[in-house]
Amino acid sequence: MENREPKLKQAPYFRCEKGPNWVPVCQKCEACVLAWKIFATKEWFRRVNDISQRRFLVSILGQLNSLYLLQYFQNILETTQGKDFIYNRSRIKLSRKGGKEEEVVKSSLNQMLDKTVERKMKEILYWFGNSTHRTKANYTLLLLQMCDSNLLLTAANVIRVLFMKEWNSISGLHDDTPDVMFFPEKKYSGTQDTSYVSWAARPKPVSFPMSKHLGNKLGTENVDRETTEGKGESSLQCIHEMNRQIFGKGGMSRLGDDPCNLLLSLDHVQLLSSGYSKYRDFIRDLPLHLSKYILRMLDKHSLNRCIFVSQHWATLAQQVKVDQSMHSFIQNQISLLQVTKEEKQAYTGSYTRGIDPNYANKVSIPVPKIVDDGKRSRSKNQKWKLRTKTDYNLWNAYQNQETQLVQMEERNVFCGTYNIRVLSDTFDQNRIIHYNGGDLMAISSNRKIHLLDIMQTKELPIEFRGHAGSVRALFLSEEDNILLSGSYDLSIRYWDVKTGACVRIFYGHQGTITCLDVYKNRLVSGAKDGQVKEWDIETGKCLKTFKHKDPILAAKISETYIVSSCERGIVKVWHVVTAQLQKTLTGHEGAVKCLFFNEWHLVSGGADGLVMAWSMVGKYERCLMAFKHPKEVLQVSLLYLRVISACGDGKIRIYNFLNGNCLKVIKVDARGDPVLSFFYQGNRMVAHTDSNILVFQFENVKWQYSSDKNKVKKSKDKEEEREETSLGDEHSRSTIQGHSLKDSVSSKQEFSKSRVHLKQTKNLSSDDMETPVGEVSHPLQKLWKVPMTPDRFLLTISALQQAHNSEEFAYPHRPRPQVIDAWGPSIPYPRKVLSLKGKSVQHAVDQLRSSNLPTGVRQTNIPLEIQKLQPNLKKSLHSPRVQATVPQPSLIRPKVSDSLRGDEHLTSSIDGTMRRAGPLTSMQVIKPNRMLAPRGGTATLSPKKERPRFYTTLDPLRMNTGFMLMTVKEEKEFAEAKMKEYEASVSTKEVDPGKASKAAWIRKIKGLPIDNFMKEGKTAAPELGQNVFI
C-alpha cells in the first residue's frame, strides 16, 4: 500500500501550507517546486519554435509510466477528436500586420534561445522523471494549457499510442507475476467488459512494432533489462530503467546509448505523434497499381477524405486524381471525334428524330385504384408474363394492379432552340447555388452568401454573414423575401433578402445540413445525422422528426407528403399530418442523391446512373419506369410528363415519361464537368457545374395540341378538295365538246371523266332496291387524288392494253387494281341490289334499262383507232411457214383530230357504227367526238433481241366480259364449250424436214434415244399416213 497514490482529480488543489496561494514561500515542498518549474517553463516554452515545443511535449508525455495517468489524460484530450475542434484547427491563420518583420525577429531570438533551451529541457525532464504521480499530473495539465490546437492533437495521439502499448504489455503478463495491484474508479462495476486499472508492479514488456521495417530494426537493438536492487542506485539509472520500459522493448523508440539523453529526437517524435491503430494498413502493403485500382473505385468526396488518412494514402489519392482527370480528358476528345449527326443536332439546340418542340397533348394516364379504406386494390385473374421491348411503357407498368385513368397534360418542354449566357466561368468545387425564378440567384462557396442579378450579371452588395462553418444548402424565394441556408456548423439560418439580417436560427440537427426545401410556411431539412426535420418558419420550432439509418442526401415537402432519401439508396415517403411512414421504395444500388415528386408520380436519381419513376398514389411500391444514364444522376425533375435529369457526364437529358424515349440531349460544358444542379422557371434554365454557371434562354413556344392539329388538317383537306373540284369543272368545260349527230358513225369508246364529285342519286323504292349499310362512304385516303391533265387523260387510253396484261397502271401514284377492288368504288354510289322475290327477271332488267345515270355525270365519247402491228416475220409465229391461230398484234389508241395532223387518215379496222354502253347495253348510233390532242410520235417496235408478245384485241363494247352468275350445270357446259373451241382452233402442223433432222442430230449428240433416226432400213407407208415408215 506504500505505492498507492491519491486520486488525481484532487491533485490541482494541493498547495504549500507555509505561504499564501499566489507566492510560494517554501522552496522544498512539492507544491513550491512545481510552481517554480511551471514559472520557468513559461519563460521559454511559448518563445521557441514549433519543433522544439513538440519535442519537449512528447518527451514529457513519454515519462508517464502509469496506465492510470495515461487513461486520465486520454479522457481529457478526447475532445480533440470532436468536430468543432478539428474544424477550428483546420482553419487558415491570417497573417498579422508586419508579419515578415516579426518572423525575422523571432528567428533571431530562436537562434539565441536554442543554445540554452535544450539544457533547460533536459533539466526539467530529469526532475519530471523523479517526481510523483501527483506532480506529473499537475505539471502535465499546466503544460497542456500552454499548447495550441495542433500541439493538443499531437498530445492526444501520443497518449493514445502509449496507452495501447501499456495495455498490451499488461495483457502479456505471466501468471506468476507477483504483487499486482490495481485501483478501480468509483464508477467501476463488475458487469463492465473492460476496466482501466493502475498497475503497481512493473509488467513484462511486450514488443509492439509500429511498422514492419521499424520492428525488425528495433528488434535487433533490444537489450536485457537491468534489475534494480535496493534504494542505493542513482536516480539516472532509475529514469533510464523507466524509459527502457516504455520505449525499449515496446518497439517505440530508444533514447540511445547515453542514459541521460531524455529529450527525444525528431524521428522518435514523428513516430509517436503519428497515432496508433490496432488495425493493419493493407493498402500500404499492396502493390502500387492495386492500391490505385482500389482507390479509383471511390467517389470524389471519399477520395478527398483519403488524403487525411496518412501520407502514403495522400500520395496515392493525388495520383488517382491525376489519372482520372487525364482519362476524362482523353474520353472527351474521343467523344468529340466520334460525335454523331444526332448528337451534333442535340448540342446545337435542334431537336432530333422528328421531335416536335411545339407538341402538346392531353392524355389519360393510369394510376393505381384506391378503395375506400385507403388500400390499393389488386386485379384478379392476371398472370405475370415477360414483356418485350415495346411493352415497356407506363400503360404496361402496372401488373396485377387495378388502375384508373387520370387526364394529364404532356409537352415537349425544353426541346426547342436556345441561347446560352455565361454568368460565371470561375472554377470552384465548393460552390453551391439556388435559383427559384425572378432575377436573383443565391451563391455561396464558404461561410458567406451572396446574391447575383441574372439579368445584369452583377453581384449585389448585400452579404450574408453569421455561419461558423461553410454553407452546404441554400433555398431562395425572392417572391417571399426568404433566404434559408444550412451549414457545417449544424445550424439553419433564416435571412431577410432585402436587408441581409439574420431573422431566425434553427437548432436541432447533430450533423451537417445537406438539403432544404420549403412549402408555404413549412421547412424540411435533412442532415448527415440521419434525421429529417419539419420546421415552422414563423416560429422556428421543430414540428416533426423522421429518421433514417444513414445520412440524408435529399428531402422534399408538399402539402401532404415528405419524401426523403439516404446514402443507402432507400426512399421513404412520410405523411405530413399523421407523421407515419407511408411506404419505403427500394431499387437503387447506390446513394439516392436527388428527388422530385408531384401529386401522382415520384422520380429519384442515384449514384448508380438510374432515374426511377414511382407512383405516389396509395402504397404501390413497384418501380414504373427506369431511365439509364452513363454516370451518376445529380439532379432530376418532372415537368409535363417529361423527365429532366442532370448527369455526371456534363449533359442534361429530357426523357418521355410515358415510353422512356430520350427526346433531347443538352451538353452543358465542353469539358465534360458534372452538372451539379439545374433550376428552371418558364423558358429559362440555370445550370451549375464546377467550372461555370450558365443560363439557357429557350425560345417562346406556342403549344399545338393534337386536337387542334386534327381540326386544322381537316380544314386544309376540305379546302384542297374544293380547289380540285373547281379546277376539274373548269377543265371539263374547256376540253370536252358537246355531242353532234351526223349520218356517218365511226368507232368510238365511252370513258367517264375521273375525279368528279358526284351527287348521290335518289334511292329506288324500298320494294325494288336495298342499300347495305357501311358500303356508301369511303375514307378520303382511298380516293385516287392524282390531278387529271389532258396529256395524262390521253395516256390513259394507251395504257389500257398494258394494264390488261400486267395488271398494273402506268401511273406511279395510283395503286394496283387489286387494291382498288378491295377499297371498293371510288365514287360513293349506293350499291344496288336486286330484289327479285315475287317478280320476274325481265321486269327488273327493263327497269334498269329505263333508269338514267345520276345527274351531274358527264360523258365523253372518244373515237379509237386500231392499228395492226407489222412485226419481223422471220422469227415470228405469224410467218407463212407457221400455221397458228394466234391473232395478229394490234395497237389501240385514241384517234386524233385530222385538223391538227397533216398525215393521211388512219383507217379503222372496225367498220360500221359504234355501240354505246348504257347501264346494261344499248345500240344507239352516236357521232364520233373529235378530241384535241398534241402531236404524238408513232410507236416503233424492236423485234430483235426481244421476246415476241401476243396481244388480243379488246372488245370495245365490253360485252359479256364482266361477272356472270352461273349454276353448276351452266358452268360445266361453259367449260366444255371453251375446251371444244380451243381444240378446234389447234390444227396439225407440218413438220419441217430440215428442222426435224437438226433436232435428231442434236438428240444423237446428247446420247438420247432416237427411233427413226435418218429412216435407214425402213419402208415408207404413205397409206398409213404422212411421213410414216415401217
Curated annotation (Swiss-Prot):
Region of interest called Disordered, as start-end residue ranges on this chain: 709-773
PROSITE patterns documented for this protein: WD_REPEATS_2, WD_REPEATS_REGION
Coiled coil feature spans: 963-992
InterPro entries, per the entry: F-box-like_dom_sf (IPR036047), F-box_dom (IPR001810), G-protein_beta_WD-40_rep (IPR020472), SCF_subunit_WD-repeat (IPR051075), WD40/YVTN_repeat-like_dom_sf (IPR015943), WD40_repeat_dom_sf (IPR036322), WD40_rpt (IPR001680)
UniProt KW Repeat keyword: yes
Pfam family, one: F-box
Compositionally biased spans, kind Polar residues: 734-749
Record has Coiled coil as a keyword: yes
GO biological process annotation, one example: inflammatory response
Ranges annotated as biased composition (Basic and acidic residues): 716-733
Keywords associated with the record: Coiled coil, Repeat, Ubl conjugation pathway, WD repeat
Domain F-box: 280-329
Residue stretches of each WD repeat: 466-505, 508-547, 549-584, 587-624, 626-667
Function of the protein: Probable substrate-recognition component of a SCF (SKP1-CUL1-F-box protein)-type E3 ubiquitin ligase complex which mediates the ubiquitination and subsequent proteasomal degradation of target proteins. Overexpression is leading to degradation of CBX5 and CBX1.
UniProt protein name: F-box/WD repeat-containing protein 10
Organism: Mus musculus
Encoding gene per record: Fbxw10
